[in-house]
Structures are given as structure tokens and as C-alpha cells.
Amino acid sequence: MLGMIKNSLFGSVETWPWQVLSKGSKGDVFYEERACEGGKFATVEVTDKPVDEALREAMPKVMKYVGGSNDKGLGMGMTVPISFAVFPSDDGDLQKKLKVWFRIPNKFQSDPPAPSDDSIKIEDREGITVYSTQFGGYAKAADYAAQAAQLRSALESTAKYQTDFYFCTGYDPPMKPYGRRNEVWLVKSSE
């Protein structure tokens, strides 16, 4: 636990590499199209719980792994944003399922430490292109869902994206009270 806190407060912070391809807006919604680099990710999946509750279960596991709860006992530093996939129902409500994706820092990409917790998996993920919109505050599932709905409305028929899931992201540690950065990412579809 101490390693997790130390890493969160004093560890290095790396930004997940991406390139802005374009920017747009409609009404009050500003968005970017980004090409995000792939790589190795530490993932935790939680089902049968509402998103906010599932996130409270999954995040400490990822933070402990990054903070040194791994086979090498290494605190790896942070990569932001931490993203989690949510799965909307047909009515827009979020299903009781979530998957946290933490991009392993570049220094450890070729040989990431093995997690001590069996619920954490190391997965390779291809690069993705996303439509992203940003907002502040302490975000909850309802905030992410509202922002996703606004982004979908802003994109309307101008962009194709996955509809079975989207990513919610956070850039800040929980103890940061002001200037928080959250985003919703709709994954561009090739269809």
C-alpha cells in the first residue's frame, strides 16, 4: 500500500503517446480525433457491479501493481490517462461491466513485471484512433455517460465509431481537488 501511495504522489508520470489528427466542435462540445499508440497494458475486468463500484474495486489493484506489487517489486511510475472501457446498453445506461486499461510505461514495455494479483492481466493492444472530449471535476459513471451522449450527438453522421463500448479516462490522482481532467473516447470504426 505504501508503494502505491509513494508511486502515485512522487513517481514519474508519462503520457500515453498519441497524435492529434484533427479538432472539431459542435455547439458547446469540443473534440479531437487522435491516433493513440498501442502497446502492453495491465488490465483488470470487473463484472456484475455498477461502474462506479467496479472502478473502486479495480483501480487499487492496478495502482498496487504499478506501485511495486509485482514479481520484480518495482514501482514503475504512472502513465496517464488511465482508461476504462464501459459497455452501454441499448437505452444508454451502462452495463455492470468494466475493464481498466493501464498503459505500461515505455521503460517496461519490452519486459513488464508480472502482476502478483492473478486478476491483473498483461495484454498487447494495437493502436487505436479515437474521438475525444474533455471535462473536469470528480467524474462518476453518470458524468461519463452524459459526456459520451454529447460527443455522439456532436459527431452525428460525420464519423463512424464503435457503439458497443467506449473509454472513460482520468489523468489525475484522487487527491487533486481542482483542475481535474477527464475524457470520453469513442473508438473510430473502420467500417
Curated annotation (Swiss-Prot):
It is found in: Cytoplasm. It comes from the Eukaryota. The keyword Cytoplasm applies. Coiled coil: none annotated. Keywords: Cytoplasm. Its main location: cytoplasm. InterPro entries: Reg_factor_effector_dom_sf, SOUL_haem-bd. GO terms for cellular component: cytoplasm. One of its GO terms (molecular function) is heme binding. The keyword Membrane does not apply. Forms a distorted beta-barrel structure, with two helices that are packed against the outer surface of the barrel. Porphyrins are expected to bind to a hydrophobic patch on the outer surface of the beta-barrel structure. Belongs to the HEBP family. Monomer. May bind free porphyrinogens that may be present in the cell and thus facilitate removal of these potentially toxic compound. Binds with a high affinity to one molecule of heme or porphyrins. It binds metalloporphyrins, free porphyrins and N-methylprotoporphyrin with similar affinities. This is Heme-binding protein 1. It comes from Bos taurus.
